[in-house]
Each structure stands twice: as structure tokens, then as C-alpha cells.
Amino acid sequence: KGYFDSKRNQISALNKFMLNDSYIVTGTKYEVKKIDAVLYTNINQKLSGIFSAKIPDQMINGSISVFDNKLILRSDVSVKMDNFVNFGDYLNLSGTETFNAKLSIDNNASLELSSNLSNTTFSSYIDELNKRPSDNLKTKILISDLSQPTYEIENNKFSAYINNNNGYFSLGSSFDEDIKKLNFIDGFYI
């Protein structure tokens, strides 16, 4: 189907694309299987639609859009927090959490995760870090380049930046201005 603009003498096509039981293997051998998608173009050349896929530990469903050479996938993903962070008595997470995920791919691939962590327990010798599952703690995790992952974590209890053995962990917001002045290539600051 299409649209003819007689003033511009231009035809714009509206197309539908369907993918059934497809798969992708990334350069790092990460497999995404059983991809089903329905995508539509519109007159501004944006591609959008819905998808479902199997990643190694779960099925995901979400939306997809492509515009100006940028691909954005949105979905909810489930993460076993026990496997995510375990620093012994200092900070241990437990529970299974659902995150809203946004994967953006243009010149690089980035991933943003957000959740209120309502299914996660924080256990720590430091009282300020403890959290019951019933307590909401709106948290955002940003991995700005998946090929060279660094983790920026931010919520009302703490903020952290983790890059290999470098970065920082800041409890509260008292040191926000000091953190902006630090160079994190020479160690991990607490």
C-alpha cells in the first residue's frame, strides 16, 4: 500500500515485514533465537512494530523502532539478582527482578535498565544499604557501550560506576560534586 503526494510528485510506501522463527548470533556468540516480529514502515520512513524472541535464559516480548539509522528495542527482562551482585557481608542482593530494558543500536550498542526493585532484598552490614523486597527503590542501570561495558548505577541509596577494576561507589548524595572531579582510571573509590 502507499500514498501519492501530488504536490511533491512523490510516492510513499507503507510496507509490512514479518519475521518468523529467525535467529541472530552476535560477534560475541550471543544467540537470540525464535525471533518473531511484525514491522511496519510509515510515511516518514520510520520502521516500528512488535517482536518476541528467546534469549539464553528467557522469552522476551517488546517493541522495535528504527529511525535515522538507530534501532531501539524495548522489553521487560527478568534478572536473578543473586547472580548480579554479591559482595559478601558488605552487599548481597537476592530475588528475581523485572527490569524495563531499552537496547539502542546506532554507532554502538547501549543498554538501559530500570526497575523499582520491589522483588529484591539488599542485605548488608551497613544499615543504610539494607532493603526489604516490599520497599521500592527506583534504580537505573546504564551500559553505554556493550562492546566495552561500563556500568552506571543510580538510585536514592547509592550511585556507582564500574569499569573493570576502576570506578566508584557512593552511599547517599554527599559526595556527588567530589565524584565529578575524580578520574576513575587509577582505581576504585568508595
Region roles according to the model:
Residues 1, 9, 13, 19-112, ...:
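Interface amphipathic segments
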